[in-house]
A protein has these predicted regions:
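Protease zymogen maturation seam
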Residues: 20-24, 85-96, 117-179, 192-193, ...
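Extracellular S/T/G-rich loop segment that most often corresponds to the catalytic His/Ser-adjacent loop
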Residues: 184, 333-418, 422, 464
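Structural recognition of the beta-strand scaffold that forms the well-ordered cores
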Residues: 44-47, 99-100, 124-127, 179-183, ...
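N-terminal domain-start motif of subtilase-like serine proteases
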Residues: 20, 28-35, 109-111, 143-182, ...
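Secretory targeting signatures
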Residues: 1-23
Length: 469
């Protein structure tokens, strides 16, 4: 049950306020032509853009407001003599040039502020309102508390908050309406934590040439991947996925050898209905080979990029590779290095590089997986039921590699697409670039690129952050 809590929006003030009054000055207020808003951080600017949209408020609501947040270059001692004529002005401590203006007659505040704005006396004005908030959604799945990659509270001795920040958006989005294709060694679609989200009509077994991608009992990789991305949440069973409301298509491809033609078919299957193709596989990570997709596969992916999703383009996520100890580099992987692919590296519950995660210029983002001390702290996700897969039960606590980081990114993308289904494949990459968080901030691999963005060959543009996206 959501619990509604009424809180008062608090703004931090400096100790010295100013009561305004006195005789009228002989001259009009000193208008300072300065772009004060432009000196604020981009995040603060976006917040101002949101709250200053007066049309987004109800008229009756605004009529009761007696305190407003105002940005102006006019000296505080002259605020009283602006067209707005506030009764009082208080400077905001952390925002130079911002003030809280108070009006004795709340019904006239908006009209007077508009007049002041039109005269060029103020840059921005927005009402200070009481806000209602709710507690964050938390799934009732029994192993959710073990899923530190979704909500890191320090339960594995890692760094609290070092996670994908999906809980920040779960009250609004869970991936509903988005289809993730898991290209792997199969998906156990009868698994109680997967069956609800499984779409048989968009699935296929390329090894057996039939519509059922059910895996061999020893092939638990794809089932684990599916659980990380879109395991059913809040069903009192097992685990939850990052996008627990998204749909899953299963494609059994890597359980056998496959041709260029077969890979092309799998990676473009039903590209009008499938949104994301999640790929936790690639060439052997031995540091000795340069391999990539054949021409048929490249052509199929290009067609999906330009024509899939009704012309918006399909999204391809790809594991960057686990060969760091063999001095492998993700640049050697032609699949993960495709310009259309979102190459994903792995970090631990501390936010640093997992011991196996390959670096590369191709890496776009990083996401959480195993590899942290003291016990490598694996990812909790779905496993083949019974004695098959990685454990003797329906859940494994030891999944990992960039194989686990990749579906976590796929899940975050599903949340993004639910919020805006009209995003193109390039839009999605752009959002990830600008919303990812600089993890392991003191690492020497970070540098500023030609576009002024901070980037690393270990981490790409940083750790995915669903809340920021």
């Amino acid at each position: 049950m959501r619990v509604a809590i009424l809180v008062l929006l608090m703004v931090s003030f400096s100790p010295a306020g100013h009561a305004l009054g006195g005789e009228d000055p002989e001259e009009i207020p000193t208008v300072v032509l300065e772009d004060i808003l432009g000196t604020y951080s981009r995040s603060v600017q976006i917040a101002f853009e949101r709250v200053s949209d007066i049309d987004s408020y109800e008229e009756a609501e605004l009529a009761l407001v007696d305190s407003w947040l105002v940005v102006t270059g006019i000296p505080i001692e002259e605020h009283r003599w602006t067209a707005a004529e506030p009764e009082d002005s208080e400077p905001v401590e952390h925002l130079r040039g911002s003030y809280i203006w108070t009006f004795e007659d709340s019904t006239k505040g908006l009209e007077q502020l508009r007049s002041s704005f039109l005269k060029g006396e103020i840059e921005s004005f927005s009402p200070l309102l009481d806000r209602s908030v709710s507690t964050r959604f938390e799934p009732n799945d029994p192993f959710y508390d073990d899923q530190w990659h979704l909500n890191n509270t320090g339960q594995t001795s890692g760094t609290s908050g070092e996670d994908a920040n999906v809980t920040a958006v779960w009250n609004s989005y869970n991936g509903s309406g988005v289809v993730i294709s898991v290209i792997d060694d199969g998906v156990e679609h009868s698994h109680p934590d997967l069956t609800t989200n499984y779409l048989s009509q968009h699935s296929y077994d390329w090894c057996g040439d039939d519509p059922d991608p059910d895996p061999n009992s020893w092939d638990g990789h794809g089932t684990a991947v599916a659980g990380v991305a879109a395991g059913t949440g809040n069903n009192s069973i097992g685990v939850t996925g990052a996008a627990f409301g998204a749909d899953i298509a299963g494609h059994r491809l890597i359980a056998c050898g496959f041709t260029d033609s077969t890979a092309a078919d799998a990676l473009s299957y039903d590209n009008g209905d499938i949104d994301i193709y999640s790929n936790s596989w690639g060439p052997f990570d031995d540091g000795n080979r340069l391999e990539g997709p054949g021409p048929i596969t490249v052509a199929a992916i290009e067609d999906s990029i330009y024509n899939g999703r009704s012309g918006l383009g399909n999204i391809y996520t790809w594991a960057a590779g686990n060969g760091l100890e063999a001095n492998d580099n993700s640049n050697y992987d032609g699949y993960a290095s495709l310009r259309y692919a979102i190459a994903v590296a792995a970090i631990t519950h501390y936010g640093d590089q997992s011991w196996y995660s390959e670096p590369g210029a191709n890496i776009l983002v990083t996401a959480h997986s195993n590899g942290g001390t003291p016990d490598y702290e694996g990812i909790t996700t779905t496993d083949i039921t019974g004695t098959g897969g990685y454990s003797g039960g329906d859940v494994t606590h030891d999944f990992g590699g960039t194989s686990s980081a990749t579906p976590l990114v796929s899940g975050v993308i599903a949340l993004i697409l639910e919020s805006n289904p009209d995003l193109t494949w390039r839009d999605v990459q752009n959002i990830l670039v600008h919303s990812s968080r600089k993890n392991d901030a003191n690492d020497s691999s970070w540098s500023v690129n030609g576009g002024g963005l901070t980037v690393s060959h270990k981490y790409g543009f940083g750790a995915v952050d669903a809340g920021a996206a």
